[in-house]
Curated annotation (Swiss-Prot):
It is found in: Cell inner membrane. It comes from Psychrobacter arcticus (strain DSM 17307 / VKM B-2377 / 273-4). The keyword Transmembrane helix applies. Keywords: Amino-acid transport, Cell inner membrane, Cell membrane, Membrane, Symport, Transmembrane, Transmembrane helix, Transport. This is Serine/threonine transporter SstT. It is a multi-pass membrane protein. The keyword Transcription regulation does not apply. It catalyses: L-serine(in) + Na(+)(in) = L-serine(out) + Na(+)(out); L-threonine(in) + Na(+)(in) = L-threonine(out) + Na(+)(out). Belongs to the dicarboxylate/amino acid:cation symporter (DAACS) (TC 2.A.23) family. GO terms for molecular function: neutral L-amino acid:sodium symporter activity.
Length: 400
Protein backbone atom coordinates (compact mmCIF):
# COMPACT_ATOMS: atom_id res chain seq x y z
CA UNK A 1 0.00 0.00 0.00
CA UNK A 2 2.79 2.40 0.91
CA UNK A 3 4.57 1.63 -2.35
CA UNK A 4 1.40 2.53 -4.30
CA UNK A 5 1.10 5.84 -2.42
CA UNK A 6 4.79 6.57 -3.01
CA UNK A 7 4.39 5.84 -6.74
CA UNK A 8 1.27 8.05 -6.85
CA UNK A 9 3.20 10.93 -5.27
CA UNK A 10 6.22 10.35 -7.50
CA UNK A 11 4.24 10.67 -10.76
CA UNK A 12 3.08 14.19 -9.87
CA UNK A 13 -0.33 15.83 -9.68
CA UNK A 14 -0.58 17.35 -13.18
CA UNK A 15 0.25 14.12 -15.10
CA UNK A 16 -2.25 12.25 -12.92
CA UNK A 17 -4.94 14.87 -13.63
CA UNK A 18 -4.31 14.48 -17.38
CA UNK A 19 -4.60 10.68 -17.01
CA UNK A 20 -7.87 11.15 -15.09
CA UNK A 21 -9.14 13.52 -17.79
CA UNK A 22 -8.42 11.05 -20.62
CA UNK A 23 -9.90 8.11 -18.71
CA UNK A 24 -12.98 10.19 -17.85
CA UNK A 25 -13.63 11.04 -21.52
CA UNK A 26 -13.20 7.39 -22.58
CA UNK A 27 -15.40 5.98 -19.81
CA UNK A 28 -18.12 8.61 -20.31
CA UNK A 29 -18.15 7.93 -24.06
CA UNK A 30 -17.84 4.13 -24.08
CA UNK A 31 -19.68 3.26 -20.86
CA UNK A 32 -22.12 6.07 -19.97
CA UNK A 33 -23.69 4.18 -17.06
CA UNK A 34 -20.31 3.73 -15.40
CA UNK A 35 -19.50 7.37 -16.18
CA UNK A 36 -22.63 8.57 -14.39
CA UNK A 37 -21.81 6.34 -11.42
CA UNK A 38 -18.27 7.74 -11.29
CA UNK A 39 -19.79 11.21 -11.06
CA UNK A 40 -19.96 10.56 -7.31
CA UNK A 41 -16.17 10.90 -7.17
CA UNK A 42 -16.41 14.36 -8.71
CA UNK A 43 -19.24 15.38 -6.40
CA UNK A 44 -17.26 14.26 -3.35
CA UNK A 45 -14.11 16.06 -4.52
CA UNK A 46 -15.88 19.36 -5.19
CA UNK A 47 -17.80 18.99 -1.93
CA UNK A 48 -14.56 18.46 0.01
CA UNK A 49 -12.96 21.54 -1.56
CA UNK A 50 -16.03 23.67 -0.89
CA UNK A 51 -16.17 22.40 2.69
CA UNK A 52 -12.54 23.16 3.54
CA UNK A 53 -12.24 26.46 1.62
CA UNK A 54 -14.24 28.77 3.97
CA UNK A 55 -12.45 27.64 7.14
CA UNK A 56 -9.10 27.75 5.30
CA UNK A 57 -9.64 31.36 4.25
CA UNK A 58 -10.90 32.40 7.69
CA UNK A 59 -8.01 30.83 9.61
CA UNK A 60 -5.29 31.75 7.12
CA UNK A 61 -6.28 35.42 6.91
CA UNK A 62 -6.77 35.65 10.67
CA UNK A 63 -3.35 34.06 11.30
CA UNK A 64 -1.58 36.21 8.70
CA UNK A 65 -2.96 39.46 10.11
CA UNK A 66 -2.50 38.53 13.77
CA UNK A 67 1.17 37.68 13.15
CA UNK A 68 1.86 40.64 10.88
CA UNK A 69 4.46 43.07 12.13
CA UNK A 70 4.62 46.77 11.30
CA UNK A 71 7.21 47.35 8.62
CA UNK A 72 6.27 44.14 6.77
CA UNK A 73 4.71 45.45 3.56
CA UNK A 74 1.68 43.80 2.00
CA UNK A 75 0.75 44.15 -1.68
CA UNK A 76 -3.04 43.99 -1.72
CA UNK A 77 -3.74 47.37 -3.37
CA UNK A 78 -1.89 46.71 -6.68
CA UNK A 79 -3.60 43.32 -6.94
CA UNK A 80 -7.04 44.92 -6.51
CA UNK A 81 -6.21 47.50 -9.18
CA UNK A 82 -5.21 44.70 -11.58
CA UNK A 83 -8.43 42.81 -10.74
CA UNK A 84 -10.61 45.78 -11.70
CA UNK A 85 -8.53 46.83 -14.71
CA UNK A 86 -8.37 43.25 -16.02
CA UNK A 87 -12.14 42.82 -15.66
CA UNK A 88 -12.79 46.08 -17.53
CA UNK A 89 -10.42 45.06 -20.35
CA UNK A 90 -12.23 41.72 -20.55
CA UNK A 91 -15.56 43.55 -20.89
CA UNK A 92 -14.13 45.74 -23.69
CA UNK A 93 -12.70 42.65 -25.41
CA UNK A 94 -16.13 41.01 -25.36
CA UNK A 95 -17.67 44.13 -26.93
CA UNK A 96 -15.02 44.18 -29.67
CA UNK A 97 -15.49 40.47 -30.42
CA UNK A 98 -19.26 40.91 -30.56
CA UNK A 99 -18.86 43.65 -33.19
CA UNK A 100 -16.32 41.62 -35.18
CA UNK A 101 -18.36 38.41 -35.01
CA UNK A 102 -22.01 39.45 -34.56
CA UNK A 103 -24.08 36.49 -33.42
CA UNK A 104 -27.82 35.92 -33.57
CA UNK A 105 -29.48 33.48 -31.19
CA UNK A 106 -32.30 31.01 -31.65
CA UNK A 107 -34.23 31.91 -28.52
CA UNK A 108 -35.68 29.18 -26.35
CA UNK A 109 -38.44 29.13 -23.78
CA UNK A 110 -37.33 27.85 -20.42
CA UNK A 111 -38.18 28.39 -16.78
CA UNK A 112 -35.35 29.99 -14.81
CA UNK A 113 -35.89 29.54 -11.07
CA UNK A 114 -33.53 32.16 -9.58
CA UNK A 115 -34.78 35.75 -9.71
CA UNK A 116 -32.32 38.13 -11.39
CA UNK A 117 -31.39 41.41 -9.64
CA UNK A 118 -33.58 44.33 -10.68
CA UNK A 119 -30.79 46.88 -10.98
CA UNK A 120 -27.17 47.68 -10.19
CA UNK A 121 -28.15 49.05 -6.78
CA UNK A 122 -29.49 45.62 -5.79
CA UNK A 123 -26.23 43.94 -6.83
CA UNK A 124 -24.15 46.39 -4.77
CA UNK A 125 -26.57 46.13 -1.82
CA UNK A 126 -26.19 42.34 -1.82
CA UNK A 127 -22.42 42.77 -1.86
CA UNK A 128 -22.47 45.17 1.11
CA UNK A 129 -24.90 43.01 3.09
CA UNK A 130 -22.53 40.08 2.63
CA UNK A 131 -19.89 42.24 4.29
CA UNK A 132 -21.83 42.46 7.58
CA UNK A 133 -23.18 38.90 7.63
CA UNK A 134 -23.08 36.82 10.80
CA UNK A 135 -19.58 35.24 10.91
CA UNK A 136 -20.89 31.72 11.58
CA UNK A 137 -23.37 32.03 8.70
CA UNK A 138 -20.64 33.49 6.48
CA UNK A 139 -18.47 30.39 6.99
CA UNK A 140 -21.42 27.99 6.67
CA UNK A 141 -22.68 29.64 3.46
CA UNK A 142 -19.20 30.26 1.96
CA UNK A 143 -19.77 34.03 1.90
CA UNK A 144 -16.17 35.06 1.27
CA UNK A 145 -16.75 38.80 1.60
CA UNK A 146 -18.14 38.21 5.10
CA UNK A 147 -15.42 35.67 5.93
CA UNK A 148 -12.69 38.12 4.92
CA UNK A 149 -14.26 40.97 6.88
CA UNK A 150 -14.51 38.98 10.12
CA UNK A 151 -11.10 37.33 9.67
CA UNK A 152 -9.47 40.75 9.24
CA UNK A 153 -11.27 42.21 12.29
CA UNK A 154 -10.42 39.23 14.53
CA UNK A 155 -6.87 39.14 13.15
CA UNK A 156 -6.33 42.78 14.16
CA UNK A 157 -7.75 42.14 17.62
CA UNK A 158 -5.43 39.12 18.07
CA UNK A 159 -2.41 41.38 17.59
CA UNK A 160 -2.95 42.39 21.22
CA UNK A 161 -3.07 38.75 22.35
CA UNK A 162 -0.19 36.83 23.90
CA UNK A 163 2.50 35.17 21.78
CA UNK A 164 1.11 31.79 22.86
CA UNK A 165 -2.36 32.62 21.51
CA UNK A 166 -0.93 33.78 18.18
CA UNK A 167 1.21 30.64 17.98
CA UNK A 168 -1.89 28.47 18.49
CA UNK A 169 -3.66 30.34 15.65
CA UNK A 170 -0.61 29.83 13.41
CA UNK A 171 -0.45 26.11 14.24
CA UNK A 172 -4.16 25.74 13.49
CA UNK A 173 -3.59 27.48 10.16
CA UNK A 174 -0.81 25.00 9.33
CA UNK A 175 -3.09 22.09 10.24
CA UNK A 176 -5.87 23.31 7.94
CA UNK A 177 -3.32 23.83 5.15
CA UNK A 178 -2.22 20.20 5.55
CA UNK A 179 -5.82 19.01 5.23
CA UNK A 180 -6.08 21.03 2.01
CA UNK A 181 -2.97 19.31 0.63
CA UNK A 182 -4.56 15.92 1.30
CA UNK A 183 -7.76 16.96 -0.50
CA UNK A 184 -5.82 18.36 -3.47
CA UNK A 185 -3.89 15.09 -3.76
CA UNK A 186 -7.22 13.43 -4.66
CA UNK A 187 -7.81 15.80 -7.59
CA UNK A 188 -7.13 13.15 -10.32
CA UNK A 189 -9.99 11.00 -8.99
CA UNK A 190 -12.28 14.04 -8.75
CA UNK A 191 -11.47 15.11 -12.32
CA UNK A 192 -12.05 11.54 -13.54
CA UNK A 193 -15.52 11.54 -12.00
CA UNK A 194 -16.47 15.04 -13.17
CA UNK A 195 -15.39 14.44 -16.78
CA UNK A 196 -16.89 10.94 -17.02
CA UNK A 197 -20.23 12.19 -15.70
CA UNK A 198 -20.29 15.26 -17.98
CA UNK A 199 -19.51 13.27 -21.14
CA UNK A 200 -21.98 10.53 -20.18
CA UNK A 201 -24.84 12.95 -19.51
CA UNK A 202 -24.41 15.50 -22.30
CA UNK A 203 -22.10 14.04 -24.92
CA UNK A 204 -21.79 17.72 -25.95
CA UNK A 205 -24.44 17.10 -28.63
CA UNK A 206 -26.68 19.77 -27.12
CA UNK A 207 -23.95 22.34 -27.73
CA UNK A 208 -23.73 21.91 -31.51
CA UNK A 209 -26.48 24.47 -32.23
CA UNK A 210 -24.66 27.13 -30.24
CA UNK A 211 -21.19 26.63 -31.71
CA UNK A 212 -20.81 30.24 -32.91
CA UNK A 213 -21.70 31.91 -29.61
CA UNK A 214 -19.47 29.41 -27.79
CA UNK A 215 -16.58 30.21 -30.11
CA UNK A 216 -16.98 33.94 -29.41
CA UNK A 217 -17.17 33.36 -25.65
CA UNK A 218 -14.26 30.93 -25.41
CA UNK A 219 -12.24 32.93 -27.96
CA UNK A 220 -12.56 36.07 -25.79
CA UNK A 221 -11.52 34.15 -22.70
CA UNK A 222 -8.49 32.65 -24.45
CA UNK A 223 -7.54 36.11 -25.74
CA UNK A 224 -7.65 37.50 -22.20
CA UNK A 225 -5.71 34.55 -20.78
CA UNK A 226 -3.01 34.43 -23.48
CA UNK A 227 -2.72 38.05 -24.67
CA UNK A 228 -4.27 40.65 -22.35
CA UNK A 229 -3.23 39.15 -19.01
CA UNK A 230 0.37 38.57 -20.18
CA UNK A 231 0.51 42.22 -21.33
CA UNK A 232 -0.64 43.37 -17.88
CA UNK A 233 2.01 41.15 -16.26
CA UNK A 234 4.68 42.43 -18.67
CA UNK A 235 3.89 46.05 -17.81
CA UNK A 236 3.81 45.27 -14.09
CA UNK A 237 6.94 43.11 -13.85
CA UNK A 238 9.02 43.97 -16.94
CA UNK A 239 9.67 40.24 -17.38
CA UNK A 240 8.57 37.54 -19.82
CA UNK A 241 5.06 36.81 -18.48
CA UNK A 242 4.42 33.47 -20.17
CA UNK A 243 6.26 31.12 -17.78
CA UNK A 244 4.12 32.46 -14.93
CA UNK A 245 0.96 32.54 -17.08
CA UNK A 246 1.35 28.89 -18.08
CA UNK A 247 2.12 27.80 -14.51
CA UNK A 248 -1.11 29.44 -13.33
CA UNK A 249 -3.18 27.99 -16.18
CA UNK A 250 -1.73 24.51 -15.64
CA UNK A 251 -1.84 24.40 -11.84
CA UNK A 252 -5.02 26.42 -11.26
CA UNK A 253 -6.94 26.75 -14.53
CA UNK A 254 -7.23 23.03 -15.32
CA UNK A 255 -8.73 22.16 -11.94
CA UNK A 256 -11.03 25.20 -12.00
CA UNK A 257 -12.25 24.22 -15.49
CA UNK A 258 -13.59 20.92 -14.19
CA UNK A 259 -14.79 21.95 -10.73
CA UNK A 260 -16.55 25.02 -12.20
CA UNK A 261 -16.26 26.74 -8.83
CA UNK A 262 -13.96 29.62 -7.90
CA UNK A 263 -14.69 28.93 -4.24
CA UNK A 264 -13.69 25.28 -4.56
CA UNK A 265 -10.48 26.37 -6.30
CA UNK A 266 -9.38 28.68 -3.47
CA UNK A 267 -7.40 25.88 -1.72
CA UNK A 268 -5.75 25.02 -5.06
CA UNK A 269 -4.69 28.66 -5.54
CA UNK A 270 -3.50 28.98 -1.94
CA UNK A 271 -1.34 25.91 -2.40
CA UNK A 272 0.05 27.25 -5.71
CA UNK A 273 0.84 30.64 -4.14
CA UNK A 274 2.73 28.82 -1.39
CA UNK A 275 4.66 26.77 -3.97
CA UNK A 276 5.56 29.97 -5.84
CA UNK A 277 6.93 31.43 -2.61
CA UNK A 278 4.56 34.40 -2.58
CA UNK A 279 3.98 36.76 0.36
CA UNK A 280 1.48 34.99 2.66
CA UNK A 281 0.09 38.21 4.15
CA UNK A 282 -0.87 39.20 0.60
CA UNK A 283 -2.16 36.00 -1.01
CA UNK A 284 -4.18 34.97 2.05
CA UNK A 285 -6.32 38.07 1.35
CA UNK A 286 -6.15 38.57 -2.44
CA UNK A 287 -6.94 35.00 -3.51
CA UNK A 288 -10.24 34.59 -1.59
CA UNK A 289 -11.11 38.19 -2.47
CA UNK A 290 -10.33 37.45 -6.12
CA UNK A 291 -12.72 34.49 -6.02
CA UNK A 292 -15.40 37.05 -5.18
CA UNK A 293 -14.60 40.16 -7.23
CA UNK A 294 -12.08 39.19 -9.96
CA UNK A 295 -14.57 38.22 -12.66
CA UNK A 296 -13.12 38.81 -16.13
CA UNK A 297 -14.89 35.69 -17.40
CA UNK A 298 -18.21 36.88 -15.98
CA UNK A 299 -17.83 40.28 -17.69
CA UNK A 300 -17.21 38.49 -21.01
CA UNK A 301 -20.28 36.27 -20.57
CA UNK A 302 -22.52 39.22 -19.66
CA UNK A 303 -21.41 41.36 -22.63
CA UNK A 304 -21.28 38.66 -25.31
CA UNK A 305 -24.73 37.26 -24.54
CA UNK A 306 -26.28 40.71 -24.04
CA UNK A 307 -24.95 41.97 -27.38
CA UNK A 308 -26.02 38.72 -29.06
CA UNK A 309 -29.55 39.45 -27.85
CA UNK A 310 -29.27 43.00 -29.21
CA UNK A 311 -28.09 41.71 -32.60
CA UNK A 312 -30.91 39.14 -32.65
CA UNK A 313 -33.49 41.89 -32.12
CA UNK A 314 -31.81 44.25 -34.60
CA UNK A 315 -31.00 46.85 -31.93
CA UNK A 316 -28.28 49.30 -32.92
CA UNK A 317 -25.40 49.42 -30.43
CA UNK A 318 -23.48 52.72 -30.36
CA UNK A 319 -19.95 53.21 -29.05
CA UNK A 320 -21.27 55.13 -26.03
CA UNK A 321 -23.78 52.41 -25.14
CA UNK A 322 -21.10 49.71 -25.58
CA UNK A 323 -18.77 51.62 -23.24
CA UNK A 324 -21.56 52.00 -20.69
CA UNK A 325 -22.29 48.28 -21.00
CA UNK A 326 -18.62 47.53 -20.27
CA UNK A 327 -18.70 49.69 -17.13
CA UNK A 328 -21.93 48.09 -15.93
CA UNK A 329 -20.61 44.60 -16.70
CA UNK A 330 -17.40 45.31 -14.77
CA UNK A 331 -19.25 46.49 -11.67
CA UNK A 332 -21.93 43.80 -11.96
CA UNK A 333 -19.37 41.04 -12.45
CA UNK A 334 -17.75 42.01 -9.14
CA UNK A 335 -21.06 41.15 -7.48
CA UNK A 336 -21.67 37.98 -9.49
CA UNK A 337 -20.70 35.73 -6.58
CA UNK A 338 -23.53 37.24 -4.53
CA UNK A 339 -26.17 36.45 -7.15
CA UNK A 340 -27.79 33.01 -7.47
CA UNK A 341 -26.91 31.80 -10.95
CA UNK A 342 -23.80 33.99 -11.13
CA UNK A 343 -22.99 35.92 -14.29
CA UNK A 344 -25.92 34.54 -16.30
CA UNK A 345 -28.51 36.07 -13.96
CA UNK A 346 -26.89 39.49 -14.47
CA UNK A 347 -27.69 39.43 -18.20
CA UNK A 348 -31.22 40.91 -17.74
CA UNK A 349 -29.65 43.82 -15.86
CA UNK A 350 -27.22 44.50 -18.73
CA UNK A 351 -29.93 43.89 -21.35
CA UNK A 352 -32.08 46.60 -19.77
CA UNK A 353 -29.55 49.18 -21.05
CA UNK A 354 -30.82 48.40 -24.57
CA UNK A 355 -34.49 48.18 -23.55
CA UNK A 356 -34.49 44.44 -24.27
CA UNK A 357 -37.68 42.94 -22.76
CA UNK A 358 -37.15 40.82 -19.66
CA UNK A 359 -38.77 37.73 -21.20
CA UNK A 360 -36.27 37.88 -24.09
CA UNK A 361 -33.39 38.41 -21.66
CA UNK A 362 -34.46 35.36 -19.66
CA UNK A 363 -34.48 33.27 -22.85
CA UNK A 364 -30.87 34.34 -23.36
CA UNK A 365 -30.17 33.23 -19.79
CA UNK A 366 -31.69 29.85 -20.67
CA UNK A 367 -29.25 29.55 -23.58
CA UNK A 368 -26.47 30.37 -21.12
CA UNK A 369 -27.49 27.41 -18.98
CA UNK A 370 -27.53 25.13 -22.04
CA UNK A 371 -23.96 26.05 -23.01
CA UNK A 372 -22.89 26.30 -19.37
CA UNK A 373 -20.93 23.06 -19.46
CA UNK A 374 -18.35 24.89 -21.61
CA UNK A 375 -19.06 28.57 -20.83
CA UNK A 376 -19.05 28.19 -17.05
CA UNK A 377 -15.99 25.93 -17.11
CA UNK A 378 -13.94 28.33 -19.24
CA UNK A 379 -15.16 31.33 -17.23
CA UNK A 380 -14.13 29.76 -13.92
CA UNK A 381 -10.75 28.67 -15.29
CA UNK A 382 -10.00 32.23 -16.44
CA UNK A 383 -11.25 33.87 -13.24
CA UNK A 384 -9.49 31.54 -10.84
CA UNK A 385 -6.14 31.30 -12.62
CA UNK A 386 -6.05 35.10 -12.89
CA UNK A 387 -6.42 35.41 -9.10
CA UNK A 388 -3.05 33.80 -8.46
CA UNK A 389 -1.48 35.32 -11.60
CA UNK A 390 -2.15 38.91 -10.52
CA UNK A 391 -1.19 38.12 -6.93
CA UNK A 392 2.17 36.82 -8.14
CA UNK A 393 2.70 39.85 -10.39
CA UNK A 394 2.41 42.20 -7.39
CA UNK A 395 4.80 40.13 -5.27
CA UNK A 396 8.41 41.39 -4.86
CA UNK A 397 9.58 38.06 -6.28
CA UNK A 398 8.13 39.00 -9.68
CA UNK A 399 7.39 42.74 -9.55
CA UNK A 400 9.61 45.24 -11.33
Amino acid sequence: MRSLIAMYQRIGLVPLIIIGLVLGVLIGWLAPNIGIALGLLGTLFVGALKAVAPILVFVLVMAAISQHRSGNEVYVKPVLIMYMFGTFLAALTAVGASFLFPTELVLVNAVIEPVPPANLKEVLTNLLMNLVANPVNAIAEANYIGILAWAIIIGFSLRQASDTARTVVGDFSDAISQVVKWVIALAPFGILGLVANTVAETGFAALAGYARILMVLVGCMLFIALVVNPLIILVKTGKNPYPLVFICLRESGITAFFTRSSAANIPINMNLARKLGLHEDTYSVTIPLGATINMAGAAITINVLTLAAAHTLGIEVTFASALLLSLVATISACGASGVAGGSLLLIPLAASLFSIPNDIAMQVVAIGFIIGVIQDSAETALNSSTDVLFTAAADPKYAR
